[in-house]
Amino acid sequence: MKKQKGISYKTKGWMIVLLLPITITIYILAIIGWQQLVKIPVVQEWAEIINSSTAKLDVPTEYIELYKKAEDNYGVPWTLLAAHHRIETRFSTMDPLLSPAGAEGHLQFMPCTFVGWSHPSCGGLGKGDIPEKDKISPAIIEQYGGYGVDANNDGKADPYDLEDAIFSAANYLAASGAADGEIEKAVFNYNHSEKYVEDVLHFYHLYESQVKNLQAAAYSSQ
């Protein structure tokens, strides 16, 4: 049997010399191509979803007890409350806790939803013209049929108080069907946006899949 000749070192050297510029060119074109690709709306949307899915996934352990207390009172899954909190204000890290549309507090309530749409100033998007002292008055909220809750019994139902805000969100979501398992309907009632529903449900399902680990982390931090 004849011994097969391998590729000589000289030939290999020439192959490397020839292929190296081609490899570098392909690499540069790939970078340029991606830079152009990310300008396409569909790709931008995909990138946003990936970023939102990987950024700040962890539920702050100190909040879990509040979510669970609200769940006990209203029958709304605490993981759903956490998902809303994550989407609305990134677990209260948004500054200020006031949107350009007028939504207020940790869970971004429009004043008319918090105080009640039967308030004489309410209409449109729900910003209303409600005096500040009336916005946090349990008596006024009861009078106008709002969803604000004085969860800590300090005499105020304050959307800027975290416990009050979480309980108020649970109250609203329960009334919208979440306590009866109509999760998607309740989320849509909270914000009439399909994208909003998609985002909240994404984190809700994520937290549901991690619920044992999240609860264990909350317990160990106490």
Where are these regions (language model features)?
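Catalytic glycan-binding domains that act on GlcNAc-containing polysaccharides
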Residues: 38-222
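N-terminal Lys/Arg-rich, disordered targeting/topogenic segments
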Residues: 1-13
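Intrinsically disordered, low-complexity regions enriched in Ser/Pro/Gly/Gln/His and often acidic
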Residues: 5-7, 27, 107
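Hydrophobic membrane-insertion alpha-helices, especially the h-region
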Residues: 14-32
